[in-house]
Amino acid sequence: LKHILITGCGSGLGRKAAITLASRGHYVYATTHTDEQAYKLNMLNRKWKLPMESFKLDVLCKEDREKVRDLPIDVLINNAAIGDSGSIAEIDVNRFRATFETNVFCPIELTQIVLKGMIKRRKGRIIFLSSLTGRMAIPFLSPYCSTKFALESIGYCLNKELKQLPRVNIPVILIEPGSYATGFNQLNVSKQFNWMKVNSYFKNRINKLQRKQYLYFKLTESTNMDSIVMKYVAAAEEPHPKFRYIAPYVQGCVAKAKNILKK
């Protein structure tokens, strides 16, 4: 049984993964973006009585990241993420920066803090929540997709780098969810239309773009999150984990086929 820290447990996949891992006997630090989310999760756990505690860890906040420095963490799951959307031709670069700050730079900083203890103990496990969009980008969702492409590279390099340390066993793992009905995709897509309808190169095509993007997720989203949550479990528990875990299976096959055809 392991001590597992997960970021972004206030809702969605992170919340479900935290509850599932705790129900399997692991001690889970189910961290959230806000104090209110942590309070609600702790109140629910009074009934569940799972080996789980929740507290605020806003990945953007240095003081929050420092809270975990002395925790005995066996597995870190960098799950927290935000999305943004719009064309590279015109989106405010600060929106791009903000997405990278939350999805890439802050997880790197948190990973460095947790790794100090893991390297000292010579064991641990680092998991990054990437995405199938990290290998199969979607036009107008580039702020989000590009952060996931970055995590693919970061995960690969860190995994190889840690193997250079003698007698240290810290695998680095990527989890790549496809499209799931958590509400995240709709929120991500909607952000661009707040400003593109006012002033955009594409304003005459906004309605068509809007219909197309919402239809795409309506057709592809899986309503059963169990398939991807069990990948969190496998990544945390398997004695010899794979580098990459993908779900749903069909969406993973489509992404692989598209990458092959591009070549």
PLM features: what roles do these ranges have?
Residues 24-39:
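Conserved glycine-rich Rossmann-like NAD(P)H-binding loop of the short-chain dehydrogenase/reductase
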Residues 79-84:
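Conserved NAD(P)H cofactor-binding loop of Rossmann-fold oxidoreductase domains
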Residues 87-88, 95-97:
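Substrate-binding pocket helix/loop in short-chain dehydrogenase/reductase
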Residues 111, 147-150:
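Active-site helix of classical SDR
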Residues 131:
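Residue(s) in the substrate-gating loop at a strand-loop-helix junction
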Residues 164-242:
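SDR active-site lid
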